[in-house]
Amino acid sequence: MSDTLATSFRVLNYSGMLFNKGNTRCPLSSIIGGRAKTTNHVEFVTGQEYTTGGGEQPAISETASLTAPEASVITRTQKTNVTQIFMEAVGISYAKQSNMGTLSGLNVANQQANPINELDFQVAAKMQKVNRDIEFTFIQGTFNKATSDATINKTRGLVEAITTNTKAMSSKPLGLWDIADMVKKIYGANAPTDGLCLWCDATTLFQVNADAVQNGLTVVPAAREINGIALSSVVTPIGVVYLYLGECLPAGTALLLNLNAVSYTHLTLPTTSR
């Protein structure tokens, strides 16, 4: 596919305030941005998992205790993910870049082109797109590990990464007791239940609020703030769950996240010289 370049007659200059009609919200990136990790390897470790006993009462007689029990071991499983490439390009002709004073559309005396620099505008707009692509990948990314230079590394997102402690709602509205049941599942899996956050879309958020009203319960607004993101909260029998209107979620899907355990990893880019 050939490049599409910004030229004088393809990208016209206008005066007036700029408004982006696209969706640029990236709340998950904002919340976890302060915990970024770096790596020098395209594949990185997210952790190891192992399981010890669930708790039982041993039955060992004095006679049996004189002989060592049969040996056994605890095995471990390593979990990994991969980094992937996000890349955009812009092209502006020298003639276009030097022709920002020629205005199209309605012109009022003493107005000037907005933006005043085409290259700066194009780069900033592409960065907004990349940020949104990263947010989408954090949520809905489908894992693929490259096996050659011609194949693609694709980061595993949260939806795909969560394979246990799931609940199928069968198209039913999500209510407070459903949230409580998910917290119970997490507790039953021996995972921390402090600071859990329900990352949901607008429909699910409305369902939770409606259920709270019908049952005489309260959703506490702005109960907590992380990196400028205000989270509401509800109380379950096991603990407080925060609520947030997330982005890039598949329809009918909500995520119950421990935001303190979520971070992103990026490769350290080498410096280049020309």
Label every PLM stretch briefly:
Residues 253-255:
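Short, surface-exposed linear segments at secondary-structure transitions and domain or protein termini
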Residues 1-242, 247-250, 260-267, 273-274:
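Flexible, glycine/threonine- and acidic-rich loop/arm segments that mediate assembly and lattice contacts
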